[in-house]
UniProtKB/Swiss-Prot annotation:
Record field: compositional bias (Gly residues): 859-871
Major site of localization recorded for this protein: membrane
Example GO BP: protein import
Protein name per the record: Protein translocase subunit SecA
Lineage of source species: Bacteria, Pseudomonadati, Pseudomonadota, Gammaproteobacteria, Chromatiales
Annotated cofactor note: May bind 1 zinc ion per subunit.
NCBIfam families xrefs: PRK12904.1 (NF009538), secA (TIGR00963)
Requisite cofactors: Zn(2+)
Keywords of the record: ATP-binding, Cell inner membrane, Cell membrane, Cytoplasm, Membrane, Metal-binding, Nucleotide-binding, Protein transport, Translocase, Translocation, Transport, Zinc
Organism: Alkalilimnicola ehrlichii (strain ATCC BAA-1101 / DSM 17681 / MLHE-1)
Biased composition (Basic and acidic residues): 837-848
Binding site for ATP: 87, 105-109, 507
UniProt key word Membrane: yes
Superkingdom as given in the UniProt entry: Bacteria
EC number, as in UniProt: 7.4.2.8
Amino acid sequence: MFSAIAKKVFGTRNDRAVKRLAKEVERINALEPEIEALSDDQLRARTEAFREQVEQGRTLDDLLPEAFAVAREASRRVLGMRHFDVQLIGGMVLHQGKIAEMKTGEGKTLVATLAVYLHALSGRGVHVVTVNDYLARRDAAWMGRIYEFLGLSVGVVVPGQSREEKKAAYEADITYGTNNEFGFDYLRDNMAFRPEDRVQRELAYAIVDEVDSILIDEARTPLIISGPAEQSSELYQQMTRIVPRLQRQEEEDGPGDYYLDEKARQAHITEEGHENIERLLQAEGLLEEGESLYDARNISLVHHLNAALRAHTLFQKDVNYLVQDNKIVIVDEFTGRAMPGRRWSEGLHQAVEAKEGVPIQSENQTLASITFQNYFRMYELLAGMTGTADTEAFEFQHIYGLEVLSIPTHKPMIRDDMTDLVYRTAREKYDAIIEDIQWCAQHDRPVLVGTTSIEASELLSKALRKAKIPHNVLNAKNHEQEAGIIANAGLPGAVTIATNMAGRGTDIVLGGNLEAELAELGEDASEEKIEQVKRDWQARHDRVIEAGGLHVIGTERHESRRIDNQLRGRAGRQGDPGSSRFYLSLEDSLLRIFASERMSGMMQRLGMEEGEAIESPMVSRVIENAQRKVEAYNFDVRKHLLDFDDVANDQRRVIYQQRRELLEADDVSETVDAMRNDVIDSVISEFIPPGSIDEQWDVAGLEETLESDFGLKLPLRQWLDEDDSLHEETLRERIHHEVEAHYRGKEELAGAEVLRQFEKAVMLQVLDKTWKDHLAAMDYLRQGIHLRGYAQRNPKQEFKREAFAMFQEMLEGLKREVVGLLCRVRVRAEEDVEAVEEQRRRQGDMQYRHAQANSLSGQGAGGEGAAGGTARGPVQQADQLPFGRKVGRNEPCPCGSGKKYKQCCGKLS
C-alpha cells in the first residue's frame, strides 16, 4: 500500500529515469535549427569530425547530443522519417547498454540508428542482431541508407557467404546478422586453421532486436557445430516398435510402464515398466537373459529407449514438428515458425524420425558449442529492444546485468484488453470464438485469431469453413504466403487465423497495407491511379477505425505472459483503436496442468450451465499466477543450465585463448620443448618414482613405454648393467639428453622451417581432437550428475569438481599425445604439413545446429525448439576475459581451480 502511494507521489523508478533523459532531448532539439542549415556534404563531414574527437579522447557521452541530432537530420533527408522525442529517449537507453521496451508500431528499427551511429564512431564495429535473415537483409538495406549517407560502411552476415564476404561484412562499421550466424562465426573462428581464416573482430557493442526472444526464449538451446558419429540407426527403429506396447500410468502408484511429467516435459519408467521393458528387449534380442537394463554395457539401450519414449509421448506431429519432404522439421514453440535444418540433440530427432517412418539421419558428435547466454556476455556493451520485456526484467538484470526501461508511446494507447472468458470444454470455447468472429465480420472489424499450434489453427479453420466464414490461415505450413496474408489482415471484416508467427514483428495496418498496394502498381503508374489507390485505402482505413479497429482473439494462454502480450500488441498500434480477448477452457494445457482443480471447483460452486463462461478479474489473476509459476520454473531451469554451462564456458575460454595464441605464433618450438620435457619427466616418474629405491623401479615397463608411445628405443637395462653409478637423477638426465638428441636429429633431416610448421599443425589438430572428446565426456557427465543428489551431494559442486579433474586430465593427455606424435612421426617434406592441414580443414562434413538442450538436473529443460534467457549475470567481472585478452601468469586461472594460471591451465603453453 505504502509502495503504491510513494509511486503516485514520487513516480516510479522508470518514470524518473525517463524524466532525466527528457532533459537531454531538449539539448538535442536545441541543436536542430543549426543541423538543418547544413548542406549534405557538411552533414556528412560531421562524421569524420566526430571520429577525430573520439581519437583525441572525447567520450561518446560528450558527443551524444550532436551525434543524435545529425542522425535524426540524415534520417529525415534520406528516409523522410524524423525521430520523435520518445525515440530519442529510446536511443539513449540503447547507448547506455540497457533494454528499451517499446510498444508495437513505435519504430524500434529507426530508434536503433541513433545508438548504432554513435557507437560506430568509435571504429570498433557495431553488431545489430535480428531474429531472422530476412530482417537482417531488410534492415541493412533500409537503415543502411542513413549510415552510408553519413559516410559509414554497412555489412550483413548471412549463411552461405564466402569467407571473404564475411570478413568484409565484419570489417564494416556496422554489421547486421542473426544471433545464430554471429554465434556460429565465433565458433568457426575458434576452429580456424590459419589466422587469416578468422572473420570476426572484437565483440565491442551489440544491439539485439527482439531481445527477449533471443536472450530468454532461446537461452536453453546452444549453438552446436557437429560432425557425424558412427552409430547404427537400427536401434531407433527397434525402440519405436517397443514403445507403443508400453502402457501409461494414469495415476500415482497405479498400473503402467511409465508416467509423464508434463511440467518438466519428461517421461519416467516405473518399476513395473522396468521389468516389462526388459522382457520386450529380450524378445527383440537386444538384452541377454539375466542381464539388467541398467548394466553399464547397456547404457546405449537406456539412451535410445528414453529418446523413443519422449518422441512418442511428448512430441506431437503438427504441434512440435512437421513432416515435410520426408524430413522432420521442428516448429518453434515461441514463434510458431518451421525451422528447417535445426535438429534436436541427444537422439531425440532420430527417435522422432523412426516414429514417423522417415529416413533416420546419423547422430552427430559435438565439435564446438556455445549458449547464447555465454556468447552475448562476451560483448563489452550489450543493449536490446523489444515490445515485451518488463515481465522478464528480473531475469535480464540477474543473468545479463541489463536494466529494462519502458519508453512512453508517442500517442496514448487506447486498446481495450477485455477479461478472459473461461469455459468448461474446448468445444464450448470454440463455439464462442466462432460467434465472436461472425459478429466482427458482419460489422467490418478485422479479426486476428492467435493459436498455439498448427493443429489448433487447422481445427479452427475447419470450423470457420463449416460456418461459411471466409478466412486466411497463417502457420508454418504456408509461411511463404505470410507477407500477402499480413498485408490483407487489416481489411474491413478480414479474418486471419495465425500461430505465434503473427505475434512478433508483424505490423497489421488498418485498412490494408498501402505501401504494398502502391508497390504493386509499378513505377509507370499514373499520378491519378496512385491518388485513387490512396483514396480507396483511406476510406477502408476510416471504416475499420469507425468499427473499432483490429480485434485480437487468443484461443489459449501461452506459458509465458510475454507471448500473450505480443499477440495483444498487434492491435492498438500508434494510437489506433482495437481490442483483445482470450477464450479459455479447462481442457487447455496451461489450466489442465497448473490451475484446473481450483477453476473446476469454482465453476461447480457457481452451478454453470453448458456454454456459460466465467468472466471475472479474479479468474484472470488465477491464470496469471499459473503463468507466473511456469515462468519461475523456466527461469530456474535456465539459471540451472547457466550454472552448469559456466563451468564449460570457463574451460572454453582457456582453450580458445590457447588456440588463438597458437594460431598467431610463427614458432611454437619453445612450447613444444617445454611440453616434451614435462611429458618425458612424468613418464619416467610413473616407472621410477622420485626418491624411490632401485627395487621399486620398473625399467622394462619404461623401456616399453618409451618405444611404443614415443618411438624411442633406449637400452635402459643395458645402461644400468654397464654403469653402477647411474642413480635416479643421472638416469633421468640421460633419458632427457637422448630424447633431445633424437628430436634434433629429426629437425636436421626435415629442416627447421618444415618442422616448425609441422609442430604447429600437429598441436592444433590434437587440441581440436582432445577438446572434441572432452566435450563428449562433459555431455555424459552432465546427463548423470543429478543422480549424485540421491547420495546427499550437491550435483553442481560435484559437476564443477569432476569437470575440473577431467579438464586437467585432458590437458595432460593433450601434451602426451602431441609429444608422442612429434617424436614418432617422420616428417619428409612440406607435403606432410599440407596433408595435416588438409585433414584439419574438412569443413564440409560439419553441421551447424541450434540444438535442444536438456536440463542438467534430470528434469527436462525443454520440449520443442527453445525456451530461454541469456545473461550478463553473477559471474565476477574479474573472471570475464575481454575478447582476446591474455591472462597474466600470476592471475587466478579462469577455469575456476583457484590456482594461479601458470600453475594450472597455463602449463599448456
